[in-house]
Amino acid sequence: MSAAADAAPWRLDDPHVIGALVAGRLADPFAILGPHQTAAGLVLRVLRPEADTAEAIDPDSGSSYGKLLKRHARGFFEGLISKNTAVPRYRLRFTREGDTWDEEDAYRFPSTFGDLDLYLLGEGRHQRLYEKLGAHPMACDGVDGTRFAVWAPNASRVSVVGNFNNWDGRRHQMRLHPGIGVWEIFVPGAKPGNLYKYEIIGRNGELLPPKADPVGFRAEVPPATASVVNGLPQMEWGDGEWVEHRIGKNDRKAPISIYEVHLGSWRRHEDGRYLSYDELADRLLPYVKDLGFTHIECMPVSEHPFSGSWGYQPVGLYAPTSRFGTPEDFARFVDRCHHEGIGVIIDWVPAHFPSDAHGLARFDGTALYEHEDPRLGFHRDWNTLIYNFGRREVANFLTANALFWLDRYHVDGLRVDAVASMLYLDYSRQPGEWIPNKHGGNENLEAIAFLRETNTALFGSHPGTTSIAEESTAFPGVSRPVYAGGLGFGFKWNMGWMHDTLDYMQHEPIHRQHHHDRMTFGLIYAFSENFILPLSHDEVVHGKGSLIGRMPGDRWQKFANLRAYFTFMWTHPGKKLLFMGGEFAQEREWNHDWQLDWHHLDDPMHRGVHDLIRDLNRIYRSEPALHELDCEPEGFEWIDASDPSISTYVYMRKGTGGARPVVVACNFTPVVRENFRIGLPNAGIWREILNSDDRRYGGSDVTNGTVTATTDEPWHGRPASAILRLPPLGSVVLVGEA
């Protein structure tokens, strides 16, 4: 090398900068690498650790713009390639031990972010941030590749690493957008299917564990933890008519009967393999449609490393789990659900996240997504971390995620998990383990604001969708609109009803008279919220056994109790939710590691419960009185529940306009109630449309025939009455003929 070259004014001579660059610890690599205009002309600087030589070439002719000088043994090259400062199109040619290869220079491509996107990201108000952050395959200047972008404001350096660069953090050190904290780079040649993570150096120089992409759209099949380049799901949707008309399908006046399903254990192949999304559509949808459920609710589909969490400890909020297929496969599953007339609700977990090293925990070396103080940021019940809802960027990340599932996957609603843990700062904490809010109270004001903002965005941008709160306290106005001071959810799980009624049903019939109010208490508050009655997965795990296993008595009585209870539930005010397996009275506790016990359907007693659920869904949908006023006090009247000694309940459901009333009589003792007179709103013909004791369901067939004639004899404060045979451990449903 000549002395003149040594003294070239365009050379980078700062050994500290070069040392930081080759060590992969330079905060702003774009300030050094790539083409740079100088007084002497166009200088090109390249870092390629494996190369012996480097030169810039014309991509069309292959002619050389000039060889680059190797300035550092670890692969830093530099050279003046033109006296002109205009940047030509070029490629890089490298050699190593006789091998030659060409590649594009990632550092010649400018940022693809617009000023508005950067402003909204910086403000934490970008509701479609998933269109900018994450991995997006695209073409820049005619070159195919992938743009990677991630939020890590406290990092001193971020690189994207993957199988496209041998997981070498020196190769693709990213561009920082100052003041916003977003790092970005376009990597030529990176394509869908490539694995990647982010290699991050914290503010104090510490190298963090490689991180999966918080906005990654696909992940490796667990237990592997890398993100997969996929881009936003591409789908030719065929559900336009469904989406256009779904406003009435998710409304509080609509019949909503939800089949809760864990996709990994509903059915499996004989060798234990999961069904794919397509196979689930082939087998699950006809089954659900035949049973008459209006919706399925999928336990969390967001990617999660630990199957034993059932999805409630997600790491990849933007990625449908790869256990069952690709993002496009999941989109097709939703599309097929809609084609069959079935709505799709997914469980969504914004309350907390796991502490897995590859996840969000201390993402950039600081408590970025969580709180630093464990009194705010750590959940002892689940050993998980709690989102910092007061940080605008974090709240935006979550709100955008909620909208993402509705926008990109056309889901019809979100069931928000563990809302109670979000609302209260002292949730599951002892004195001294929590910090009061600014008013000295225990409400998490930041979480409340986040939920209101998310629900407002959801209903505003996707009319006809809904949100459902799993909320176990008496927090007021959960399903009240935000403009009326509520949290803005569409519905709330009625946990109180579930606990009270299951407690009642577990008592031996002879003792139920002492717990009579367990079945009536729920009507005191039944219309304070838009309630869903949930018999969810939580009731068949952790040693609770199965629903049928919690019923008292011998085998016949257990089934009779369950049938009577289901009939009570389906005719009680509130939308319905039943966890898979309950529809045929699975006897063992649910196990996420294996499929349901489908052989039960060969047993007439189990098949009878299955057929009862089908008929309950049918009358629930067909009789407006059973669903139109689920959430209104005008839709329910007690006829008689005044005699605890016989454990009977008689009530009426009403609809709007000319809807015919429905009268229900329940007997929760094993004694046949002959000549059981009930009051009715009018005389005439009343028809028994369902009897849980019907022999078709495995009952003793104490029924009332097709029709029941009434008399004008007043009873129970009603102008007419009828005499029934009330079956043992049975419920009867009557409708008045016009």
UniProtKB/Swiss-Prot annotation:
Protein name in UniProt: 1,4-alpha-glucan branching enzyme GlgB
Gene: glgB
EC number: 2.4.1.18
BP-aspect Gene Ontology terms: glycogen biosynthetic process
InterPro entries: A-amylase/branching_C, Branching_enzy, GlgB, GlgB_N, GlgB_N_E_set_prok, Glyco_hydro_13_cat_dom, Glyco_hydro_13_N, Glyco_hydro_b
HAMAP family recorded: GlgB (MF_00685)
Pathway terms, separated by semicolons: Glycan biosynthesis; glycogen biosynthesis
Keywords of the record: Carbohydrate metabolism, Glycogen biosynthesis, Glycogen metabolism, Glycosyltransferase, Transferase
